């Protein structure tokens, strides 16, 4: 039997030439976006003032299973892709488990995460359309960094609204984004109408991704030749991230390995959706029975404690309405250290798959997450991002179950990025000052009270 190497590296020639679209495989596609004024399904014209034309086409495409990746995007991808698929031999040994553990590492670029996969695609299409300026939000900073890299490469101006608490926790993220040419504004800010309103209603707030989205959208609609781009949640972002799963499946197929469990952290859902796409497509066609697990923070539990309802994607309630698992656009998450998971909602694709019983969701508290992150970095040598460490936590839990039952399951998880800008969080954990935040039912009800009444 061929020994599986520590790292399974694909060649440059094996880089996927197509993204995979999960929606055509689903028995029932996610509900369409709803125009919050007319309460009718959004058309391309409804979305055109905010998003790039080609991205709108991808967003609304429920038909094509594969979409070709333009050569210019593939050329950019080759600077950091294919990314390594690693067999976690050292972690397996430390856990004393018969399970095989694999992780797909997306932190091999300067942004430190998977976010660059969609950033380069979105900026490329903006450039093709002749746009000169983009706006966006960022939580932990990986998306903002990725987009600043892509904008610097293609020569487009960028304004980034960064969740305030994350900006304070990770000041050097701002320096990196500015080095690539971006303008970075902590959110909520006094530079927008919605920011000023949120500050007035929630003095001292640390902000949220929903709030930052509102500010970025407001600026995009008031700036000439400008569009807004989003780093997660939307269908086209999940599409671009499918390259993660496609490479993962190709690497495993080389050695005849079939996963039993696939695990991903879930904030907006794009990395999870991208990782599971080819495996879920096969499951939907009856070709496997993989168990999928979405892992979210206990402090922002949209899947495990949220409601499946139409909701706005932003705090300012300016986006189209999306049917998703949500805590309500007015929900303000506690200032936990997983900035990239501080979002009230969830990808409509991931939400629909979860609602249809195609995957499980778990929430974990951050002290348990950092316990797993610490063990992982000591075994595997990579300092993981807090977001990624949610998947590590559950992968370890599943491996421990295998130790107890004697089952030799194959566990695959997404290591979405590195934690080098999260050292304050690691320091808090190491010093024993980290505190778990879990919203009460009363806290959640405040968010649910902001849900719009929609009949569709």
Predicted features and spans:
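Positively charged, low-complexity intrinsically disordered leader regions
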Residues: 3-131
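Active-site-proximal loop->helix
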Residues: 135, 143-206, 302-312, 423-431
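Active-site/ligand-binding loops adjacent to catalytic centers
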Residues: 68, 198-236, 244, 256, ...
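Alpha-helix C-terminal capping segments
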Residues: 121-131, 145-157, 178-179, 276-286, ...
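Active-site nucleophile and cofactor-binding loops and adjacent substrate-binding regions
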Residues: 105-116, 134-144, 234-237, 263-268, ...
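Buried hydrophobic positions in well-ordered alpha/beta secondary-structure cores of metabolic enzymes
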Residues: 84, 103, 115, 122, ...
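A short, small-residue-rich loop immediately preceding and capping a beta-strand
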Residues: 118, 129-165, 258-272, 292, ...
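Claisen-condensing/thiolase-fold acyl-transfer catalytic domains that form or cleave C-C bonds
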Residues: 266-274, 366-432
């Amino acid at each position: 039997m061929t020994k599986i190497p520590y790292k399974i590296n694909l060649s440059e020639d094996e880089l996927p030439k197509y993204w995979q679209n999960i929606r055509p495989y689903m028995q029932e596609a996610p509900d369409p976006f709803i125009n919050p004024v007319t309460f009718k399904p959004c058309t391309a014209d409804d979305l055109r003032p905010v998003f790039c034309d080609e991205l709108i086409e991808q967003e609304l495409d429920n038909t094509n299973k594969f979409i070709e990746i333009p050569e210019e995007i593939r050329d950019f991808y080759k600077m950091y892709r294919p990314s390594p698929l690693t067999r976690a031999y050292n972690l397996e040994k430390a856990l004393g488990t018969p399970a095989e553990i694999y992780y797909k590492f997306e932190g091999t670029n300067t942004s430190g995460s998977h976010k660059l996969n969609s950033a380069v695609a979105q900026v490329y299409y903006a450039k093709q359309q002749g746009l000169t300026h983009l706006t966006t939000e960022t939580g932990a900073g990986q998306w903002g960094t990725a987009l600043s890299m892509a904008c610097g490469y293609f020569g487009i101006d960028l304004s980034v609204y960064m969740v305030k608490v994350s900006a304070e926790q990770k000041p050097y993220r701002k320096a990196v984004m500015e080095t690539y040419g971006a303008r970075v504004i902590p959110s909520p800010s006094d530079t927008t109408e919605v920011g000023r309103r949120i500050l007035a209603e929630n003095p001292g707030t640390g902000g949220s991704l929903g709030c930052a989205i509102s500010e970025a959208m407001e600026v995009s609609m008031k700036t000439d030749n400008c569009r807004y781009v989003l780093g997660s949640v939307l269908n086209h972002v999940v599409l671009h991230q499918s390259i993660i799963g496609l490479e993962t499946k190709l690497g495993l197929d080389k050695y005849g390995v079939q996963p039993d469990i696939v695990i991903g952290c879930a904030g907006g859902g794009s990395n999870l959706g991208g990782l599971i796409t080819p495996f879920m497509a096969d499951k939907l066609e009856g070709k496997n029975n993989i168990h999928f697990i979405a892992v979210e923070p206990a402090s922002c539990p949209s899947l495990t404690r949220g409601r499946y309802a139409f909701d706005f994607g932003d705090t300012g309630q300016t986006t189209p309405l999306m049917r998703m698992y949500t805590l309500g656009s007015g929900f303000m998450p506690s200032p936990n250290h997983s900035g990239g998971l501080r979002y009230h909602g969830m990808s409509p694709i991931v939400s629909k798959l979860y609602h249809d019983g195609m995957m499980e969701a778990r929430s974990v508290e951050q002290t348990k997450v950092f316990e797993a992150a610490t063990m992982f970095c000591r075994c595997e040598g990579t300092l993981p991002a807090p977001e990624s460490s949610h998947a590590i936590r559950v992968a370890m839990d599943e491996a421990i179950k295998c130790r107890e039952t004697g089952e030799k399951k194959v566990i695959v998880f997404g290591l979405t990025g590195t934690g080098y800008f999260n050292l304050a969080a690691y320091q808090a954990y190491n010093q024993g000052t980290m505190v778990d935040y879990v919203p009460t039912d009363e806290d959640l009800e405040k968010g649910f009270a902001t849900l719009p009444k929609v009949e569709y």
